[in-house]
């Protein structure tokens, strides 16, 4: 319910290592980060 909603601030940083891992392909990096956020969202949905 809306009165029980909680929010967190989330900051994600792509470091040079991850940038190099995906050969600077920002679409692949965005996809990976988006998947991470979805997993975290599902994990925190029940707390």
Curated annotation (Swiss-Prot):
It is found in: Secreted. Binds 1 zinc ion per subunit. Residues 6-47 form the Peptidase M12B domain. Inhibited by 1,10-phenanthroline and EDTA. Its main location: secreted. Keywords: Calcium, Fibrinolytic toxin, Hemorrhagic toxin, Hemostasis impairing toxin, Hydrolase, Metal-binding, Metalloprotease, Protease, Secreted, Toxin, Zinc. It comes from the Eukaryota. GO terms for molecular function: metal ion binding; metalloendopeptidase activity; toxin activity. Pfam families: Reprolysin (PF01421). Its cofactor is Zn(2+). Ca(2+) binds at residue 9. InterPro entries: MetalloPept_cat_dom_sf, Peptidase_M12B. One of its GO terms (cellular component) is extracellular region. Expressed by the venom gland. Its EC number is 3.4.24.-. The keyword Calcium applies. GO terms for biological process: proteolysis. The keyword RNA-binding does not apply. Belongs to the venom metalloproteinase (M12B) family. Monomer. The metalloproteinase is a probable venom zinc protease that induces local hemorrhage in the skin of rats. Degrades type-IV collagen, gelatin, laminin and fibronectin. Has fibrinolytic activities. Has high hemagglutinating activity on red blood cells. Cleaves insulin B chain at 29-His-|-Leu-30, and 38-Ala-|-Leu-39 bonds. This is Snake venom metalloproteinase jararafibrase-4.
């Amino acid at each position: 319910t809306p009165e029980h909603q909680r929010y967190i601030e989330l900051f994600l940083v792509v470091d040079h290592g991850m940038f190099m891992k995906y050969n600077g392909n920002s679409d692949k990096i965005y996809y990976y980060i988006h998947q991470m956020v979805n997993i975290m969202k599902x994990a925190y949905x029940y707390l």
